[in-house]
């Protein structure tokens, strides 16, 4: 593969897409292949729609068409990743290589990334991962979004399998790293909690090998132990307890996360957010720590965090005509589910309900982890519990919380809620992405 030719095409285009339907004119189109699609079949359509060039597999039939706008490569995904790495290595700010902050973790990745971006944007032109484009395709696309005006980049990396982070750090080559936390998620791919730590720890491994720095939550014993195992890391500590900060209690007048952050030994600054759930305090602390390191004042960092409004059903709090909803329906695993329930337990409300969907990709631990959540629900004595999915159905044979209603799908639960309206409750809505728990929100 001629990386120089490919990079010249990219510089000429400036924009990259893998979706032929998203062509607006002038893009570099990559014909990726998946289980149910082959982008090579859409390469000519992409060119007709206005793409300037299309990168295709050299063995695909379209490669023989002779169109000079086609760039044939052995593997289009590998070419996309190689192009991103080359772009990262050849992007400079004031004569120095662009600084990249790499971010991963079991929970809170996207929220933390958004908060970091918000804080750093006070002082810098920041390019960061859009949404949760954090996989083998999303990370190179994020890196290729870096432009001549970028002063700092924040790249989110997700992982479902042991070698995912190891591959992704080679694409974005971070100078700084931050692991939000490590917990029980994607156990089907990682095999165990130790497997999760080993996989996420590849970010620390890369930075240790390359003289990089990490932002370390000094309150998190797992992360502290992981960092201690790796020599050569420059550690920048932060943490709620480490700083002597406080998470203030929520109430009806202050339903969102509030914190008191020490400006000095004598003075605390109050921070009020639009984030639901005390578990977000560590995400906020991470963003403040990154901002402080890069010269953003504490006052400006607090102001930036206070202005951040979550979206896409991530730690959102919504007051409807009938209920108060804690919407955290984007994803779920045992660690984040337990944290969300702890937060619900801390809320002062006359009536409380939990509407939970299955936690997926837990492998042989699935039933036991769902049983653990049911036991937690029993201890909370909620006014209403609604459960969705086959994994919860299996767990219900071992533990059956009082006032629990089970549905096979979120659509089934939505229909039940329509027939049995819920009013006056504070309701937690959470589940794995595939369960689509957001479909019940209109009935609440």
Predicted regions: what they are:
Residues 79-218, 222-233, 419, 443-444:
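Phosphate-binding loop of NTP-binding sites
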Residues 103, 109, 312-314, 434-442:
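ATP-dependent carboxylate/acyl-activation modules
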């Amino acid at each position: 593969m001629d990386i120089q030719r490919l990079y010249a095409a990219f510089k000429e285009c400036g924009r990259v897409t893998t979706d032929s339907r998203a062509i607006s004119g002038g893009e570099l189109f990559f014909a990726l292949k998946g289980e149910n699609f082959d982008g090579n079949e859409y390469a000519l359509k992409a060119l007709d729609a206005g793409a300037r060039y299309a990168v295709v597999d050299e063995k695909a039939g379209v490669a023989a068409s002779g169109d000079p706008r086609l760039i044939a490569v052995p593997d289009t995904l590998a070419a996309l990743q190689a192009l991103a790495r080359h772009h990262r290595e050849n992007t400079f700010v004031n004569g120095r290589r662009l600084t990249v902050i790499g971010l991963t973790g079991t929970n809170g990745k996207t929220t933390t990334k958004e908060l970091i971006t918000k804080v750093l944007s006070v002082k810098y032109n920041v390019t960061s991962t859009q949404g949760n484009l954090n996989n083998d395709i999303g990370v190179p696309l994020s890196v290729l979004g870096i432009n001549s005006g970028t002063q700092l980049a924040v790249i989110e990396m997700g992982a479902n399998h042991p070698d995912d982070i190891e591959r992704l750090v080679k694409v974005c080559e971070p100078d700084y790293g931050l692991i939000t936390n490590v917990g029980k998620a994607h156990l089907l791919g990682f095999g165990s909690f130790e497997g999760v730590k080993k996989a996420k720890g590849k970010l620390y491994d890369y930075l240790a090998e390359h003289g990089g720095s990490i932002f370390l939550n000094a309150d998190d014993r797992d992360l502290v132990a992981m960092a201690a195992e790796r020599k050569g890391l420059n550690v920048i500590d932060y943490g709620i307890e480490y700083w002597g900060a406080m998470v203030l209690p929520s109430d009806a007048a202050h339903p969102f996360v509030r914190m008191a952050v020490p400006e000095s030994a004598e003075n605390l600054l109050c921070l009020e957010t639009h984030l639901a759930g005390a578990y977000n305090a560590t995400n906020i602390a991470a963003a403040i720590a990154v901002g402080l390191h890069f010269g953003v004042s504490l006052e400006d960092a607090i102001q930036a965090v206070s202005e951040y409004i979550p979206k896409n059903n991530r730690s959102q709090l919504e007051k409807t005509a009938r209920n108060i909803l804690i919407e955290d329906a984007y994803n779920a695993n045992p660690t984040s589910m337990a944290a969300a329930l702890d937060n619900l337990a801390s809320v002062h409300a006359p009536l409380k309900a939990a509407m939970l969907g299955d936690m997926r990709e837990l492998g042989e631990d699935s039933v036991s982890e769902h049983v653990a959540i049911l036991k937690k629900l029993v201890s909370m004595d909620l006014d209403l519990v609604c459960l969705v999915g086959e994994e919860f159905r299996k767990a219900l044979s071992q533990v059956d919380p009082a006032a629990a209603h089970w549905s096979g799908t979120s659509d089934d639960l939505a229909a039940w809620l329509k027939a049995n309206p819920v009013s006056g409750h504070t309701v937690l809505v959470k589940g794995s992405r595939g369960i689509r728990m957001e479909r019940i929100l209109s009935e609440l």
